[in-house]
A protein has these predicted regions:
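Nucleic-acid nuclease catalytic cores
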Residues: 82-111
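Beta-rich catalytic cores
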Residues: 42
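Short, conserved beta-strand edge motifs with alternating hydrophobic and charged residues
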Residues: 29, 56-59, 92
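Short, electropositive alpha-helical surface patch
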Residues: 107-125
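Acidic-basic catalytic patches of nuclease active cores, encompassing PD-(D/E)XK
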Residues: 1-37, 160
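Charged phosphate-binding loop/patch that engages nucleotide di/tri-phosphates or the phosphate backbone
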Residues: 125-160
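Conserved catalytic cores of phosphodiester-cleaving nucleases, focusing on short active-site segments
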Residues: 46-48, 52-63
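Active-site-adjacent loop/helix micro-motif of nuclease/hydrolase catalytic cores
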Residues: 38, 63-75
Length: 160
């Protein structure tokens, strides 16, 4: 069931994105498997363009309080896109037991890994003392899935 939840949430992201940013572009990069388990040649799930910003977005869903970085198999590929002006690289994460949708910039994940952390925890969200940037995506639960408003992503700065 969890895999079905994840795939349906991933498929819902473009609809919410287009509702949030009318006239924007969001393109799904279909998985091109390399032949090895859980590997893909594509750097992310979606490439989106809105209001002069390019977004490289990996979409993940996870049960529980934490999202282990070991589940982010695209980390190395995504990392090669860090540092470009007006390009936002990160993960849209749905912790479905908490009805929480968040955006975690890849630079935050990079810093967490450098600090020895192995995962993103729900306690980091909305925590003023958390030194890592994690952005709550305003969302409303509709039966199972969340309707998300991605407009908060316009406030991201270079490096987020």
């Amino acid at each position: 069931m969890a895999n079905t939840l994840a795939k349906k949430f991933e498929a819902k992201v473009p609809d919410d994105w287009r509702r949030t940013f009318p006239g924007s572009v969001i393109i799904r990069l279909p998985d091109q498997m390399t032949g090895y388990k859980d590997t893909s040649k594509n750097p992310c799930d979606y490439v989106a363009f809105a209001y002069g910003m390019l977004y490289m977005l990996e979409v993940k869903s996870h049960k529980g309080n934490t999202f282990p970085f070991s589940c982010l198999t695209q980390y190395e590929n995504l990392s090669s896109y860090l540092g470009y002006e007006d390009v936002r690289v990160g993960v849209i994460l749905w912790l479905y037991e908490h009805d929480a949708v968040m955006y975690v910039p890849l630079n935050s994940i990079k810093q967490m890994k450098a600090d020895g952390l192995k995962s993103v925890n729900i306690k980091m969200l909305d925590n003023e003392n958390c030194k890592y940037k994690i952005v709550r995506i305003p969302s409303e639960k509709k039966r199972i899935y969340m309707d998300s408003d991605y407009s908060v992503m316009l406030t991201l700065k270079d490096g987020d």
